[in-house]
């Protein structure tokens, strides 16, 4: 089984700086100031790492600090200071994150840290870049240009949707991104939590219509960071992401820092496999509406329909880059797809495409050899006679 490597960028990150004693206590109704002046924080004010903060804010804006635990509302903008009312208080410690609901901050999308990380990824031949906090199509375009200019033309971009702007612009983002990730953790800070399930379903459905790969991620088996077994609610969450039509589902803290990483992967895989068997993909295919825009789309759709009509055991697709395989995969045909390619990089990346069994094969110099190899691979992979 090929394994692709994804590099996760830091993305635009807004944080407060440090306090004299490491932390303070804020109470509802307090006045607290965010400043671009370089100071050591105290009970009344703290520095931020974003120099254009005052230009981007306006009176009445809300600032969510420490993953939304603390809520500030801008009362006055004065010089380098944003003077705020504390709407929801709590303990505030060094270097906590800031979020700005329903705002697009005017910043360069790629920081120096991001560029250094991307150059590392290019040097080490990663397959995907997960682009954090994508707000608009231009963010993806800036990343694509940087990759192309530095030898990363083959690296594909997965745009992480983590704010309202990303949701609102998802269709144009999908025009140039190679897929999206629904990063529900930060999305649930930027957007009221009650909206996240509906937004998840909207984004997955939109991607299915557009033929774009979509990963559902974050807090899927969160309790398994500390516990050997998931809750029933978490298993239902995993299953619902599969029912909705996710191309892939993803663990984060559970496998990166949890006590039971193997058990978490096993529980997620077993739940996904069982759920897949309960879905009537033939019925979904017959009732689905797709945005077919090209001859390749039309041929791919017809291939799936024909495979269903003749009760084919599998569909074999040969492709150098993997693009044609992905075009067939987008229709979620209830027939296994064998994706043959001579490119090791394409072979690894095809593992993210729904319903595809990637096969790395030798180069061929004629159609006859290609068909012969395809038949042999189909028999081997599908255990056909």
Model-derived segments and spans:
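Non-catalytic helical/linker scaffolds that mediate oligomerization, partner binding
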Residues: 1-385
